[in-house]
Curated annotation (Swiss-Prot):
Compartments it resides in: Golgi apparatus; Golgi apparatus, trans-Golgi network membrane
Native organism taxonomy: Eukaryota, Metazoa, Chordata, Craniata, Vertebrata
Chain's role: Plays a role in controlling biogenesis of secretory granules at the trans-Golgi network. Mechanistically, binds ARF-GTP at the neck of a growing secretory granule precursor and forms a protective scaffold. Once the granule precursor has been completely loaded, active PRKD1 phosphorylates ARFIP1 and releases it from ARFs. In turn, ARFs induce fission. Through this mechanism, ensures proper secretory granule formation at the Golgi of pancreatic beta cells.
PROSITE patterns, per the entry: AH
Gene Ontology cellular-component terms listed: cytosol; Golgi membrane; trans-Golgi network membrane
Biased composition (Basic and acidic residues): 22-35
Keyword RNA-binding among UniProt keywords: no
Main location: Golgi
Modified how: Phosphorylated by PRKD1; phosphorylation delocalizes ARFIP1 from the Golgi and disrupts its ability to inhibit the activity of ADP-ribosylation factor, an important component of the vesicle scission machinery.
Protein name per Swiss-Prot or TrEMBL: Arfaptin-1
SMART domains reported for this sequence: Arfaptin
Amino acid sequence: MAQESPKNSAAEIPVTSNGEVDDSREHSFNRDLKHSLPSGLGLSETQITSHGFDNTKEGVIEAGAFQGSPAPPLPSVMSPSRVAASRLAQQGSDLIVPAGGQRTQTKSGPVILADEIKNPAMEKLELVRKWSLNTYKCTRQIISEKLGRGSRTVDLELEAQIDILRDNKKKYENILKLAQTLSTQLFQMVHTQRQLGDAFADLSLKSLELHEEFGYNADTQKLLAKNGETLLGAINFFIASVNTLVNKTIEDTLMTVKQYESARIEYDAYRTDLEELNLGPRDANTLPKIEQSQHLFQAHKEKYDKMRNDVSVKLKFLEENKVKVLHNQLVLFHNAIAAYFAGNQKQLEQTLKQFHIKLKTPGVDAPSWLEEQ
């Protein structure tokens, strides 16, 4: 009997119909292994060849120096083993290829966002929430004060000064309204006197028998119209000064008073909240609320004290300015009226010069900017 050749049980080598070894699978494995390895790692070219099955070694691995340019990386390769592919993928994710061609390994970790990055929508929502809470507290405080249930902080001296200022403002507005009415009526009278003087002058030229009489009346009406224009200038100056005092200076002070009153309401509202929390139990849940309420109360107390000082200072300066302005304007008004009805033209003109009042000549337009230059 012919002796059978020993066979290796570890591997079976297929043979083609011509009796040659079928190494197509080995070439396919070598090609896949080359493609799966990362390019540019400085590895030598590896070739795996198989010898006869009757040899003592299963195969010989021949290694030589790598020659030629490295192949460009392929986008995706099917690895012969899933485990090897997963390991290569993990190694590839930690490799960074710089411009020089060398690979450096970096550590991957969780991404931490900076605290400075804020959402504008969340900021607006927070502002709306604070405004709504503050409005609710202030509204509740106002209703409680009107119903007589809540307490309010009162500065008796400052409140009295504010009440006097508001009352004086109403009276000054009434004087201003009456002075404007007088100015309108005086303007109509001056206009009528001027027309009447022109009519008398025309009749003086056409009526020879009454030439002198019409002439006297024409001169009188023209003189009255001239003096009326002078008085009208003084009254308009008085109106402008009082209007500035009432609608600008006093109004600015009253705006500060309104801010002071708003600060007072906020102060009382947060003071009431703090008092209610202090009357309740003190435990781990209420202590943070009490501390926050104490902080808000202190902030609004400082704001209230600041606004109260601002109102006191403005009221003091307003009183000094009001006395000075009204003193000059009342003297002007009295002297102009007295000189006009006394028929003292020189005294009337002297009064206007004393207060640096320039009258606009009727029928004369204002000079252009070229003439002023």
